[in-house]
Amino acid sequence: MAIKRTKAEKKVAYDKKLCQLLDEYTKVLIAVADNVGSNQLQEIRKGLRGDSIVLMGKNTLIRRCIKVHADNTGNKEFLELMPLLVGNVGLIFTKGDLKEVREEVAKYKVGAPARVGLVAPVDVVVPPGNTGLDPSQTSFFQVLNIPTKINKGTVEIITPVELIKKGDKVGSSESALLAKLGIRPFSYGLVITNVYDSGSVFSPEVLDLTEDDLMEKFASGVSMVASVSLAISYPTIAAAPHMFLNGYKNVLAVAVETEYSYPHADKIKEYLKDPSKFAVAAPVAADSGAAAPSAAKEEEKKEEPEEESDGDLGMSLFD
């Protein structure tokens, strides 16, 4: 016969378990567990078994344990979890990939009926079509202003109807109608709201970022740093190439306007004094590109006389 532990003993065991998890793990997912049943939670635990542990409990108890652990070990990083312990939340300690764990948790959402008084997490739309209900059930549709018609002895909804809006409470009429139609519009499961990793807390959307997204953000940041550096004339690695180029342009402009001379500036001065050189430079590039085809044509012309001489030689044999 199992010995029933007292409330104090349970609290001591819980503190010991949580402190052990804080020592072993550096990654934690904070999840809201509203409307999640014990059987559903058990299935989630089974699915995560191996590299993750789901811990539920009272927020005050978890806060106290985290604070005691920080005082005893000197590790203050987990104190970042304290402000996140609000409402019906649980902690998922993991050694696996954070994104994969979040995706695994999302698999265990289950459909739920629209019970009276629940706040709708999503819009509920009743689709058009045959309901399979007999004409005596039309009162439900009339109360909710749903257009219907009788088709082959059953009630048929003519157009799609937005029955419940997101954020509204479910009324008795809406709940009864959805139950008769066999519609379970809501789905509940653990919802990851925050991610903790080695002292840093961030939104779960960060887990969806790809390498391309990071490279785009990095390139945008480098471009912004370069722009600011150029604007305030502050040298940085990002702005250095542009600063050298702008400086060279300024030196070249001064050399062109004055008698100061150096090889590159002299060449620019020649072009500015005689603009026709710009026109001469372009055909030279074009001619070099056309040289190869013309050479090929000349070779073909040289080969043609050889074929004609062979023909003449053949004709002379018959003479």
Curated annotation (Swiss-Prot):
The keyword Ribonucleoprotein applies. CDD domains: Ribosomal_P0_L10e (cd05795). Pfam families: Ribosomal_60s, Ribosomal_L10, RL10P_insert. Gene3D superfamilies: 3.30.70.1730, 3.90.105.20. Residues 286-295 have a biased composition (Low complexity). Phosphorylated. P0 forms a pentameric complex by interaction with dimers of P1 and P2. Interacts with NSF. The keyword Heme does not apply. GO terms for molecular function: large ribosomal subunit rRNA binding; structural constituent of ribosome. PANTHER family: 60S ACIDIC RIBOSOMAL PROTEIN P0 (PTHR45699), LARGE RIBOSOMAL SUBUNIT PROTEIN UL10 (PTHR45699:SF3). Ribosomal protein P0 is the functional equivalent of E.coli protein L10. InterPro entries: Ribosomal_protein_uL10, Ribosomal_uL10, Ribosomal_uL10-like_insert, Ribosomal_uL10-like_insert_sf, Ribosomal_uL10-like_sf, uL10_eukaryotes. It comes from Oryza sativa subsp. japonica. Residues 286-319 are annotated as: Disordered. Belongs to the universal ribosomal protein uL10 family. The lineage of its organism: Eukaryota, Viridiplantae, Streptophyta, Embryophyta, Tracheophyta. GO terms for biological process: cytoplasmic translation; ribosome biogenesis. This is Large ribosomal subunit protein uL10. One of its GO terms (cellular component) is cytosolic large ribosomal subunit. The gene is 60SP0. Highly expressed in stems, inflorescences and immature seeds (at protein level). Expressed in leaves and mature seeds (at protein level).
